């Protein structure tokens, strides 16, 4: 990994982006770099991460480095990342928690054929996930749900907790959690989960964890529909609803920080099979805008693209 002069770097703001090797994460890295910020691009796969950094450097984004990070591995890669940032940059100014998974598997060939039949550029294609015939091509299991919560919710918590001491050294620390409008409370259909997540004054990490445990228990016992969870995308919806709730808790806990969550929109990425209303570049702009709010900017809010939204 190429060295950077420490004296130069410490004068720059420093950002960590999780899941930065492709899609929205890659574009977030590019845009933060263009804003004069030193970017640590992280992802699980070393080869893909190094290739992403090389691609950015080849397009004149020199202030980007790679460090491996598995958001489900707090002992090894997270600790190593924290040590790297402390030694190299002395502090951390911006954390963008972007890494995430869908929580279900797809019969890819048949799904792509369905997209082709509808028309990739058709206005109708963005509604494909609502179609029962499309949902029949998708499978949700306990194992996939567990992975989804482990990455989308617990992964964010773990990364944030490990990097918090470095963020506290910043004059203007920011945490941006990349969420989804799918995680809005209006889509949380389990009554107990809605009651817990909707009570902002009583929210705690422990209460949010209760919702996660309830969901996983119902997945294991095949009681998802019986107990009123969403019939499709229950793990993803719940993971993002819990992420939004965690954002609120964290913002109250550390008022010196700007802590916000944002839905970048339905973005045309590999995870979405190219379906969306926005390009990855456009989706990333919604995230970067919040990461670069003025020092007196808001905290504890949810943004749907560029608009302030109710949780």
Swiss-Prot record:
Optimum pH is 6 for the reverse reaction (reduction) with activity decreasing sharply towards pH 4.5 and pH 7.5. Optimum pH is 9.5 for the forward reaction (oxidation) with greatly reduced activity at pH 6. Optimum temperature is 40 degrees Celsius. It comes from the Eukaryota. Its EC number is 1.1.1.248. Changing residue 185 to V: Almost 2-fold decrease in catalytic efficiency. Keywords: Alkaloid metabolism, NAD, NADP, Oxidoreductase. One of its GO terms (molecular function) is salutaridine reductase (NADPH) activity. Transmembrane segments: none annotated. Changing residue 275 to V: Slight decrease in catalytic efficiency. Has potential use in industrialized synthesis of the antitussivum codeine and the analgesic morphine. Changing residue 181 to A: More than 2-fold decrease in substrate affinity. 1.5-fold decrease in catalytic efficiency. This is Salutaridine reductase. It comes from Papaver bracteatum.
């Amino acid at each position: 990994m190429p060295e950077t002069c420490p004296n130069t770097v410490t004068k720059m703001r420093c950002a960590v982006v999780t899941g930065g090797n492709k899609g929205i994460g890659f574009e977030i890295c590019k845009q933060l770099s263009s804003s004069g910020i030193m970017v640590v691009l992280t992802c699980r796969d070393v080869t893909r991460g190094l290739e992403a950094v090389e691609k950015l450097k080849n397009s004149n984004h020199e202030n980007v480095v790679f460090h491996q990070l598995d958001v489900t591995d707090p002992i090894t890669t997270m600790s190593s990342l924290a040590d790297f940032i402390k030694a190299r940059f002395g502090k951390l100014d911006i954390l963008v928690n972007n890494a995430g998974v869908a929580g279900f598997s797809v019969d890819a060939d048949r799904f792509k054929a369905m997209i082709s039949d509808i028309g990739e550029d058709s206005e109708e294609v963005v509604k494909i996930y609502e179609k029962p015939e499309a949902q029949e091509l998708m499978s949700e299991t306990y194992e996939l749900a567990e992975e989804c919560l482990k990455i989308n919710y617990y992964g964010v918590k773990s990364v944030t907790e490990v990097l918090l001491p470095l963020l506290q050294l910043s004059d203007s620390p920011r945490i941006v959690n990349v969420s989804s409008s799918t995680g809005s409370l209006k889509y949380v259909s389990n009554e107990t989960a809605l009651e817990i997540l909707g009570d902002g004054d009583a929210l705690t990490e422990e209460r949010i964890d209760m919702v996660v445990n309830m969901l996983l228990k119902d997945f294991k016992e095949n009681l998802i529909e019986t107990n009123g969870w969403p019939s499709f995308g229950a793990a993803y919806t719940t993971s993002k609803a819990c992420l939004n709730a965690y954002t609120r808790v964290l913002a109250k806990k550390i008022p010196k920080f700007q802590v916000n969550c944002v839905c970048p929109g339905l973005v045309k990425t590999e995870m979405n099979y190219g379906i969306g209303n926005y390009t990855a570049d456009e989706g990333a702009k919604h995230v970067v805008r919040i990461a670069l709010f003025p020092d007196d900017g808001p905290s504890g809010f949810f943004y749907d693209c560029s608009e302030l939204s109710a949780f």
